[in-house]
């Protein structure tokens, strides 16, 4: 009895490679989807968010506008500083009054500011200057808030008024300084004796008023130079 070994040969009917082909197709599709994924993601990205702007204080802004604004702030502070000396000079001169009794109270010498026309003019000039400085503060604030070329007319107006007030204070201070000098030193040729040896309080008040007035004149000079510089740069 012979046994024959049966050999089984599997026939390829075209169905067996189907799973492999399907796997290859899926891999190709996945790779293609991965390749195109960044493009679709990048296309779907929203627009770039706006950058956050940091607010810079208006005093620190660079350029011509910041320069003009800084000078405007200094202008405001100088006007406030000049108001004190002019007001103090006016009050000190207006209250300069001293009496000197000789032997009895019925025989007295009197020294008062209105006895000298120069001191009267001096008092009025300082009062006008103090009032002007107060009235000019709102205009100075406008220049601070709007330091552009549109406020050139305001700057020019302040410049002209500053020049007039400086000239007024200079004239009044010079006239009062001459009287104070004569009161301290006298004049031998004219036979004018010094009176400050007797009227100490009167001379101290008037002398201090003259010094305060010339300090205000210096402040006005600085204001005029600053205003002229700004107007020159804005053209």
UniProtKB/Swiss-Prot annotation:
The keyword Hydrolase does not apply. Residues 1-70, 140-162, 232-235 are cytoplasmic. GO terms for cellular component: Casparian strip; plasma membrane. It comes from the Eukaryota. It is found in: Cell membrane. Keywords: Cell membrane, Cell wall biogenesis/degradation, Membrane, Transmembrane, Transmembrane helix. The keyword Lipoprotein does not apply. Homodimer and heterodimers. Belongs to the Casparian strip membrane proteins (CASP) family. Regulates membrane-cell wall junctions and localized cell wall deposition. Required for establishment of the Casparian strip membrane domain (CSD) and the subsequent formation of Casparian strips, a cell wall modification of the root endodermis that determines an apoplastic barrier between the intraorganismal apoplasm and the extraorganismal apoplasm and prevents lateral diffusion. This is Casparian strip membrane protein 2. It comes from Sorghum bicolor.
């Amino acid at each position: 009895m012979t046994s024959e070994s049966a050999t089984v040969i599997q026939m390829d009917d075209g169905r067996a490679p189907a799973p492999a082909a399907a796997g290859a197709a899926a891999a190709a599709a996945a790779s293609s989807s991965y390749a195109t994924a960044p493009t679709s993601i990048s296309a779907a990205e929203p627009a770039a968010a706006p950058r956050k702007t940091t607010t810079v204080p208006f005093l620190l802004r660079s350029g011509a506008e910041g320069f003009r604004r800084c000078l405007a702030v200094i202008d405001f502070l100088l006007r406030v500083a000049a108001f004190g000396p002019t007001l103090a000079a006016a009050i000190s001169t207006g209250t300069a009054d001293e009496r000197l009794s000789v032997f009895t109270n019925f025989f007295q010498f009197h020294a008062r500011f209105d006895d000298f026309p120069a001191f009267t003019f001096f008092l009025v000039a300082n009062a006008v200057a103090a009032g002007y400085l107060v009235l000019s503060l709102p205009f100075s604030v406008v220049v601070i808030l709007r330091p552009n070329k549109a406020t050139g007319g305001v700057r020019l107006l302040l410049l002209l008024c500053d020049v007039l007030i400086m000239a007024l204070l200079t004239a009044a201070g010079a006239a009062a300084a001459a009287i104070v000098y004569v009161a301290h030193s006298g004049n031998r040729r004219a036979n004018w004796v010094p009176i400050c040896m007797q009227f100490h309080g009167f001379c101290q008040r008037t002398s201090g008023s003259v010094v305060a007035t010339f300090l205000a004149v210096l402040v006005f000079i600085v204001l005029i130079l600053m205003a002229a510089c700004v107007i020159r740069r804005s053209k």
